A protein has these predicted regions:
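Secretory/periplasmic and organellar redox-cofactor proteins
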Residues: 9, 114, 124-144
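Zn2+-dependent cytidine deaminase-like catalytic core
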Residues: 35-127
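Short beta-strand scaffold segments in enzyme catalytic cores
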Residues: 23-31
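Short, basic/aromatic recognition patches
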Residues: 1-18
Length: 144
């Protein structure tokens, strides 16, 4: 498994350990992680603290995100895809899109290369979480 997807999975596990939704993300440039984050909607009571947004916040002001690659354990939603497009990130690796198809077509239509890794570990992590906490999941994707 890719070391950067492993790092994103580690972030997702941290989020779950904190009582949140197990989605993690890392931002990579020049072969090094420059930001990492996980979904903190539950922990922070903030509806927009998705994993990718937390990751970008933690990367901070890096000047230019071009050349950076975003890894996420789940296909980014429209909120996070908007940030990807806004900051000029041109490549996204998603752990899976079976649980949530996200905004793949939106990103691709804006010139972002999106690669779905079809990670069984990511799929199983989400299946288990959704079975245990359906109300949190449906709140997260706006389907309450």
């Amino acid at each position: 498994m890719d070391e950067f997807l492993k790092a994103a999975i580690s972030e997702a596990r941290q989020g779950k350990a904190e009582g949140g939704i197990p989605i993690g993300s890392v931002l990579v440039r020049d072969g090094a992680i420059i930001g990492k984050g996980h979904n903190k909607r539950v922990q922070d009571g903030d509806p927009v603290t998705h994993a990718e947004i937390d990751c970008l916040r933690n990367a901070g002001r890096v000047g230019n995100y071009r050349g950076a690659i975003l890894y996420s354990t789940l296909m980014p939603c429209y909120l996070c895809a908007g940030a990807v497009v806004q900051f000029g990130i041109k490549k996204v690796y998603a752990g899976e899109d079976e649980t949530f198809s996200g905004a793949k077509q939106f990103m691709e239509s804006h010139g972002v290369e999106v690669i779905d890794l079809q990670s069984e570990e990511c799929k199983q992590m989400m299946r288990t979480f959704i079975a245990d906490h359906p109300e949190l999941w449906f709140e997260d994707i706006g389907e309450l």
